């Protein structure tokens, strides 16, 4: 299936939902409205056939541009082989998008990672809590406006640093 054909078939399934299709090196990227992302992903899954795998779900911070965030879904279909990237743009300091754990249960940890590192909330997620950073961490470290100071960070389970000792070099054996 050609890239243009793939984009046209997804567009036909979602009807009046505006999709912006872009092809680069034979791979299609569809930009969809964030409020319809679940419908667009379900249509893409139907077009790609079974099995369709959510290979990756990530985000990009485009600060200072608006809309500020891109949430990016990478789908892989195997019959016939095809890859499709679908993006949704989100604005504001507290962006929210619908969870796709209903379509792909494996999106659970991917959505938690994006939430933890970018602060993007996934509405309807069954357990949206931090997955990489400590529970008491303030902020989201992959945001471009995240403070990069040299301040010491205090963790809940702080273990005092053990002083290092320099072991003297032993004299050469004779």
Predicted feature locations:
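Terminal low-complexity/charged segments
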Residues: 1-174
């Amino acid at each position: 299936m050609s890239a243009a054909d793939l984009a046209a078939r997804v567009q036909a399934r979602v009807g009046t939902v505006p999709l912006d299709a872009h092809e680069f090196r034979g791979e299609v990227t569809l930009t969809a409205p964030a409020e319809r992302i679940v419908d667009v992903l379900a249509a893409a899954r139907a077009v790609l056939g079974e099995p369709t795998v959510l290979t990756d779900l990530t985000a990009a911070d485009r600060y200072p541009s608006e809309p500020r965030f891109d949430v990016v879904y990478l789908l892989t279909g195997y019959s016939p082989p095809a890859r499709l990237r679908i993006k949704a743009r989100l604005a504001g300091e507290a962006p929210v998008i619908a969870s796709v754990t209903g379509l792909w249960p494996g999106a659970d940890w991917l959505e938690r990672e994006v939430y933890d590192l970018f602060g993007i909330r996934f509405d309807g997620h069954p357990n949206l809590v931090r997955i990489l950073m400590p529970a008491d961490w303030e902020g989201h470290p992959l945001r471009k406006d995240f403070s990069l100071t040299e301040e010491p960070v205090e963790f809940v389970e702080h273990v005092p640093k053990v002083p290092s000792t320099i072991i003297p070099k032993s004299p050469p054996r004779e």
